[in-house]
Regions:
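Hydrophobic alpha-helical segments
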Residues: 1-157
């Protein structure tokens, strides 16, 4: 998780050849990312770390693919805005960025991931000043600093 540069097309292919299903890969990716975000946020806030449960909840996975699934633009199957079916109707209504497309193979994980991300991130697409919010630097400067930090940490998507 700390080194996204190690996730290559060859590595992804080796996971699939080893028996990890494409939708399982997306679920693992989503859960790992959500847990990392929660851990880093609680650490940054100085709060107590959240403990993971000792066992997973019992249940059966849906194992159903949304309409319009195709490989690309990366290595795993996704659904493009043009091919999105009813389960993704309102997902692409605010523009299309490839990171938003990355988990579309498993809509439940997509929604779980973005419920968290939407609460942690500033809204897209414009970098507007927030009316009535006083601070020392502008929102554009905040976004610039975030971009530089992301580049420094090799956090690219």
């Amino acid at each position: 998780m700390a080194d996204p540069g190690r996730i290559t097309e060859g590595w992804y292919a080796s996971m699939i050849l080893a028996g990890v299903l494409e939708d399982e890969y997306i679920e693992i990716l989503s859960v790992a990312t959500i847990v990392t975000c929660v851990d880093v946020f609680t650490l940054g806030m100085g709060a107590e770390q959240v403990s993971l449960p000792d066992s997973a909840e019992a249940g059966k996975l849906a194992r159903s693919r949304p309409v319009g699934v195709a490989i690309g633009p990366g290595w795993s199957p996704t659904v493009s805005p043009e091919d999105a079916g009813p389960e993704l109707d309102d997902f692409y209504d605010h523009g299309h960025q490839y990171i938003r497309r990355s988990l579309t193979l498993v809509p439940d994980e997509l929604n779980r991931f973005w419920r968290l991300m939407n609460s942690l991130c500033m809204a897209n697409p414009a970098v507007n000043e927030l009316v009535g919010v006083e601070r020392s630097i502008s929102r554009a400067q905040i976004e610039f600093i975030a971009t530089r930090v992301s580049a420094h940490l090799d956090c690219c998507y």
